Amino acid sequence: MADIANYKDAASNRHLRFKLQSLSRRLDELEEATKNLQKAEDELLDLQDKVIQAEGSNSSMLAEIEVLRQRVLKIEGKDEEIKRAEDLCHTMKEKLEEEENLTRELKSEIDRLQKRMADLEKLEEALSRSKNECSQLCLSLNEERNLTKKISSELEMLRVKVKELESSEDRLEKTEQSLVSELEKLKSLTLSFVNERKYLNEKEKENEKLIKELTQKLEQNKKINRDHMRNASTFLERNDLRIEDGISSTLPSKESRRKGSLDYLKQVENETRDKSENEKNRNQEDNKVKDLNQEIEKLKTQIKHFESLEEELKKMRAKNNDLQDNYLTELNKNRSLASQLEEVKLQVKKQKELGNGDIEGEDAFLLGRGRHERTKLKGHGGEVSVSKHTSREQSPQHKRERLRNRGFALNDEHCSLSNKQVSSPAFTNKRAAKASNMGVGPDSGTQETKRTEDRLAPGSSQSEGKKGREQPSVLSRYPPAAQDHTKVWRGNPKPGTESGLKGKVEKTTRTFSDSAHGSVPNDVVGKGDKTSDFSSEAHCGKRGQVPGHASQVTQVAESGCSKAIGALASSQRASSEGLSKGKKAANGLETDANFPHSKAPILSKYPYSSRSQENILQGFSVPNKEGVDHSVAVVMEDSSQHEALRCRVIKSSGREKPDSDDDLDIESLVTAKLVNTTITPEPEPKLQPNSREKVKSRGGTRTPLFENDKNAAVENDSAKSMRSSSNAVEFPDANCAGVKNQRPFSPREALRSRAIIKPVIIDKDVKKIMGGSGTEVVLEKQKSTPKSVTSKVTSSITIYPSDSSGPRAVPTEAPRERHTSTSNIQVGPPELTSVSNHISSPLELSIHKHDITLQLTEAERVGDGSPKNRAETVVSRSSILIKPSDSVERNSHAFPAETIRWKSHSTSSEVASSDTRHITVRNAWKSKRDLKCSEDPPTRIGRNVEATNAYTQRSSTDFLELEQPRSHPPEQGTRKVGNSGDAPELSSRRTQSSLTASEVLTRRNRIGDAVTAASWNHSSNVVSLTFLPSALICLTEDLGNTEGWEMLNLR
């Protein structure tokens, strides 16, 4: 116990000791602590002091300290949060790492998947394409199925058709056999036609040979009869021998039809051959079907053709029968004509014995009858053939031969008795048609034939009767040149679209042109006409004619000219018999009564013949106040000579009555030994009321064309002409009334139309006229110029054909001479050979010198200002071409430019040929006119002046201009001729036609060089006067200039 107690005590002691130590240590620490505290308290006190001191200034610091304390406290609290956050961050890092590993794995998977997707897309596209293709294939399969069904059905149908075609083939074979038999029949018919055609051609050749022989005989008779035929003109003027062509014109139509049938048969044969070949080549069913269808169609067409051919054959047979009947009647007529020709020959022998007796007139009268009958025959049959021969006849050689043959045939007909029978009127018609075809194109020929056929029915007989009258027997007029004239009488008709009108005109033209020109082709005549037309147109325009009317005027004028031709022929005959007989115009009137039908076509043919023609017509006709027809009968006679120029020209305004072409023809009657063409450049105060009234009654309707100046002028002209001819013969108004107004004509037709005024016999003393005939022609031209000027001078140029002496220069002899020169006044637009539509109608105007002088004196009496004006009115310029028959051959070749030449009368041909001076007028003239002389037969004396239609007016003005500068020196000569006791002015104006050829040539030499195109500006009318008997005078008037005569050789 005590130990435990001790022990305890010891333990307690120890413990106490530790406590004491610890306490002592603690006390030490506390002491240190107290010391530190004390220091700290000191420092705090110091700080407090400082703080207290600084509190005033640093209160904000205290606030900040407090804030900082608070922040420290917060930071301490945040530290804990940061620790927590750190823990969280660690955890997050771990998670992120895990996620990154996952994402990597996912990316690799995505790449794999994308590649697979691309592959899948490609597969899908391929699938879609395949689907579309499948759908299309399905559609196409369906379509093919449908097609196969259709094809199968079609095959079945085709099989059925093939069977049918096989059956039809059998039928077709049978029909082919029948067709072959028919073809053989047709071939036999065509062979017979060909043989007939050969036979007819041979016959024609024989006839042509006979005609040539007859023409030679006639030429021999001409030389013997020239001197004896001068006095026959008075009687012959009554009698126109017109030998009309026969039915031969219808033959060419037959031949053409035969040709067409032959061609058709050939075509049929070719088709049959093709058929057989096709049948052989057929191997497949489809080809067979096609071939069979084609063959069936061909066979049908062939059957139709055969039917049409059969109808044509029937028609042709009927026509052939008619033609044969007509041919027989014409043969009978030809025989009667042959007997008449024998009688005429006997009378010609008597005339030779008697010399210049009156028997010639009787002979001419008989000849005229023969011609009348022939013309009547000719009218119906002749014109039909014209169109058909056109194609053959258009070669220049053929044309020449035709013209020659025609001329020979006409000569033979006049001279030979039985020989005329050889050349039937039908045959001559063929020639005339061919000749006309030469001048005209084939087209115009066909047109003309159509028109002629249409118009022939009403007016052919009348025109023929008139034609007979219009053709004065040329033999009596111009013993030397008579045959030539007769030749041209027939040759002029031109087939063409206008044949109806033109055929009639051609008839009249034939009568005049043939008598005047011998074998002058229509174109030749047309050329002269055209030249006159140009000048006349230019004059008309200058005279103030309305251009619109100009064409109509030309038409009317031309128709009037053609009428005047017939009228002249008839009137000349009548006048040759005497004025008392001249009033016999009843003959002319009778023919004229026929004229309305026959001549109206002429007017229509020459709707625009030319103003010069109109002027001539106007000169002949005064405006009808009655308005019946524009026909004006101007009767011009030399009172002393009893030479009545009765120019009845119907100037119907084409505008008023287009349909009355035929009627117009009636009035174109010129009965006068002389045709006095009066030019009325100045108004003449003096007019005979009687003559005016006469003229007015006939030409009143014509006034609308030239109502202002021309009416007065026409009245003056007619009055003068009436005054000049005391024995003026009035045409019965019945003819005028019978004449219908022409339909208006287009300028184109006017250009186509030509009126040729051909020779008329003048009864004046040959001696008188030999001296001074030139002025008469000039005056005639003036007449032809429009009546715009009242002062008229009518000039008649009579050149006696038989008078061989080249110089008839003595003007003093003029009053005595009964110079029968036919003036070929060609009035009409120029005619080109190429222009098919042109037809020239010859008008024969023979102007009596006394008529010219009378009217000149009247003009002077009237007191027309200065005598020079009268003279100018007579002929300001005239180109006279006196061309001996010998020179006709020269016309065969055309010169590039017109040459103006003077030639002496028939005997003066030698002098003329040597002396003739060629003056090229101007190149434009050439271009304006195609001068066709190549076609002229040597016998042809007429002048051919052709010009293109476009240049008609210009050419006329040019022609006048050429003449104007030359006109002054010849003017004196012309006045001398006119001076036949009437006026000194006329005496001073002796025309150069009366001058010897040498004188004319000298004047030409002086004047010709002065010719310039500028001089052509004067208003003037050109009238080409052709003196056919031995010379051709182209007379051109240029108003406003002194008269001048020039030989104008237009080739």
Swiss-Prot record:
GO terms for biological process: apical constriction; artery development; contractile ring contraction; negative regulation of cilium assembly; neural fold bending; protein localization to actin cytoskeleton; regulation of protein complex stability; stress fiber assembly. It is found in: Cytoplasm, Cytoskeleton, Microtubule organizing center, Centrosome; Cytoplasm, Cytoskeleton, Cilium basal body; Midbody; Chromosome, Centromere. GO terms for cellular component: actin cytoskeleton; actin filament; bicellular tight junction; centrosome; CERF complex; chromosome, centromeric region; ciliary basal body; cytoplasm. The modification Phosphoserine is found at S256, S261, S395, S513, S571, S575, S612, S660, S691, S746, S906, S993. Residues 834-884 are annotated as: Required for interaction with FLNA. The modification N-acetylalanine is found at A2. InterPro entries: Cortactin-Actin_Reg. Keywords: Acetylation, Actin-binding, Cell junction, Cell projection, Centromere, Chromosome, Coiled coil, Cytoplasm, Cytoskeleton, Microtubule, Nucleus, Phosphoprotein, Tight junction. One of its GO terms (molecular function) is actin filament binding. The keyword Methyltransferase does not apply. F-actin cross-linking protein. Stabilizes actin and acts as a negative regulator of primary cilium formation. Positively regulates the phosphorylation of both myosin II and protein phosphatase 1 regulatory subunit PPP1R12A/MYPT1 and promotes the assembly of myosin II stacks within actin stress fibers. Inhibits the phosphorylation of myosin light chain MYL9 by DAPK3 and suppresses the constriction velocity of the contractile ring during cytokinesis. PANTHER family: FILAMIN/GPBP-INTERACTING PROTEIN, LEUCINE ZIPPER PROTEIN 1. Component of the CERF-1 ISWI chromatin remodeling complex (also called the CECR2-containing remodeling factor (CERF) complex) at least composed of CECR2 and SMARCA1. Component of the CERF-5 ISWI chromatin remodeling complex at least composed of CECR2 and SMARCA5/SNF2H. LUZP1 is detected as part of the CERF-1 and CERF-5 complexes in embryonic stem (ES) cells where it is involved in complex stabilization but is not detected in the complexes in the testis. Interacts (via C-terminus) with LIMA1/EPLIN; both proteins restrict ciliation and may work together to regulate this process. This is Leucine zipper protein 1. The gene is Luzp1.
